[in-house]
């Protein structure tokens, strides 16, 4: 089995992901931060170390696909897309669950770069 290194910078990134999730839900006044906060280490590990993807070319044919089957935890994916350079900005996270935002309540394929499946 391959050993995965985990440095202080990784822990800080996960802590940041958790805070971003909590702040986004607090700002909009509704949503589900708990799952995004608890899945932050796993999602970070997948996006940063495991999944083959290219944020500059999110439709690259050789990419791995991440399907978030629990759509109400959309922040899990949105935060990783933000941290991973898929084109989401901090203002997009702040606009969570608002009309016309790139961060609707559930991930939507074709709406947010990096989202592979609508859940």
What are these language model-derived features?
Residues 11-15, 32-37, 71, 119:
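Short, conserved micro-motifs enriched in small and acidic residues
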Residues 1-19:
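N-terminal hydrophobic or amphipathic helices/low-complexity stretches enriched
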Residues 7, 39-119:
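Cofactor-binding active-site loop characterized by glycine-rich and histidine/acidic residues
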Residues 4, 32, 83:
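Short, flexible active-site loop motifs that bind/organize anionic cofactors or intermediates
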Residues 16-30:
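N-terminal capping segment at the start of a domain
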């Amino acid at each position: 089995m391959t050993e995965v290194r985990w440095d202080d910078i990784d822990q800080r990134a996960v802590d940041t992901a958790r805070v971003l999730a909590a702040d986004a839900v607090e700002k909009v006044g509704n949503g589900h931060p708990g799952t995004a906060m608890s899945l932050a280490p796993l999602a970070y590990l997948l996006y940063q170390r495991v999944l083959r993807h290219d944020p500059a070319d999110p439709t690259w044919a050789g990419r791995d696909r991440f399907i978030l089957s629990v759509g109400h935890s959309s922040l899990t994916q949105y935060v990783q897309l933000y941290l991973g350079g898929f084109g989401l900005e901090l203002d997009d996270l702040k606009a969570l669950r608002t009309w016309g935002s790139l961060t609707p309540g559930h991930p939507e394929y074709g709406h947010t770069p990096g989202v592979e499946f609508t859940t």
